[in-house]
Amino acid sequence: PLLVSCRWHERRAAGLLNRGIALGYAVPGSVIAVGILIPVTRLDHAIAALWQSLGQPHPGLLLTGGLAALVYGYLVRFLSVAVQTVDTGLSRITVSMDEAARSLGRGRGALLREVHLPLLRGSLASAALLVFVDTMKELPATLVMRPFNFDTLATQVYTLAADERLAEASTAALAIVAVGVLPLILLSRHIAQGTQPQDG
């Protein structure tokens, strides 16, 4: 919806948005993690202080002690991947399509639901696959921001390899490769089917 809104108002706004979002993918994951943890930790303590001022027991660190901060870090880190993929699909939807739908009495909500979403279905699926693969193998941000007793495949490989338990680490490493390759195979098949010439 954000990209569509920029498309409706001004293409320059979409360009500025893309450049701003791209910073998250350009900056190392560990830097993003530290930059997020500092304000989020302060917010955590402020929430706890407010909760205690109401006569309630200390709730703990709700954001940094759970998955909320980690998910937010992934959002900052990989939003650029999703936005670029969807923006590529959105560029194939011409303005004349929007004008034709509006001439038939469709408002912006109906235009988004009945025209844009069906045409962007492939781009949305591709964006989800790419973000999934990138998130699965992300290590620096996960190591810094993960809560206690929470591991991903990437952190498990790192921990086992650091302990020189290479045989055990290989299982998780192969799982990362397998899970990462399968979506890419599906994505390449989808792209190949979309580029095949139509008969007749």
Predicted features by range, described:
Residues 20-23, 72, 125, 129, ...:
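Hydrophobic residues within alpha-helical transmembrane segments
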Residues 21-37:
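Hydrophobic alpha-helical membrane-insertion segments
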Residues 61-102, 127-128:
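Membrane-cytosol interface at the C-terminal ends of specific transmembrane alpha-helices
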Residues 9-17, 33-75, 109, 145-148:
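Membrane-interfacial helix termini and adjacent extracytoplasmic/periplasmic loops
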Residues 23, 27, 76, 83-86, ...:
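Transmembrane alpha-helices
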Residues 136, 142-185:
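Interhelical loop and adjacent transmembrane-helix boundary motif
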Residues 5, 87-98, 102, 106-114, ...:
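C-terminal transmembrane helix and the adjacent membrane-cytosol boundary/short C-terminal tail
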Residues 1-6, 27:
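Transmembrane alpha-helix signature in integral membrane proteins
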